[in-house]
Amino acid sequence: MKIRAAVLVAPGRYEVQTFDRPKLEDGALLMRVELSGICGTDKHTYQGETKQYAGTESETDTPFPIIQGHENVGIIEELSPALEESGDFYQAPVKVGDRIVMCPDMICGKCFYCTHIQGYSWCSKSQCYGNSFTSAQWPHLLGGWAEYMYFKPGTFFYKVPENIPPKVAVLAELMACAASLDKLKDFSSYSIEGFTTGDTVVVFGVGPLGLLHLAKLGIMGAGKIICFDKSDYRLELAKKFGADLTINVDKT
């Protein structure tokens, strides 16, 4: 079986390449990709900004050629026996044909940050699907801009409820970025800083990430929500997502 992928062979240059279907390691799976988002990081890499995790202990250079895509949803095509037993991140049973989403970062579980604090965001050896793995080496298919994607052993993934369509599930990774609001609310529980119920909040920019932060703010009980952007179209969407006041900065 040959699998096609959009490969970024160098900044500014994509090629459609084909790869053999990889044989699964124990603890791995193969996902048929339904949708994969285009992140700002993908654009920067295409433009030649090739530092990943810049300024952190995980800083690396993008290993071209690479298959991008870390905002992914798809259907389990093949599942190793180990995962049939262990299930997804929450140990929910999974099988071939189930829809899943993934955490794009792979953490080591052994560094100071992994063993002393919530390691997912801070791991000093973090690697990211679509950003950290070259397609020149087996198993090749380590990004979502391909017909199929390989999940290495240790990848966090989640079964998607049947009532959630792929066009919504693909936003899971973006929504996870709104976890910063959870941290801010945590801070407010033991200091006067942070964010708490009823606070007025300003959102600068209402692209996909801004809109999902806006949705999360509504869920968390924000008071007045004010949004700034240059696009009237996006500001209209922001109103539908619950913004109380929208301001076009180019018209102010």
What residue ranges belong to the model's regions?
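Extreme N-terminal starter segment of soluble prokaryotic enzymes
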Residues: 2-4
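Glycine-rich beta-strand-centered segment in the early N-terminal region that forms part
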Residues: 22-36, 51-115, 141-142, 161-163
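Conserved Rossmann-like nucleotide-cofactor binding loop
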Residues: 39, 209, 233
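Short Gly/aromatic-enriched secondary-structure transition segments
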Residues: 44-51
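NAD(P)H dinucleotide-binding glycine-rich loop of Rossmann-like/cofactor-binding domains
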Residues: 58-65, 70, 86-88, 108-204
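Hydrophobic/small residue at the entry helix of a nucleotide-binding pocket
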Residues: 177, 209, 217
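Adenosine-nucleotide cofactor-binding segment
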Residues: 197-206, 218-252
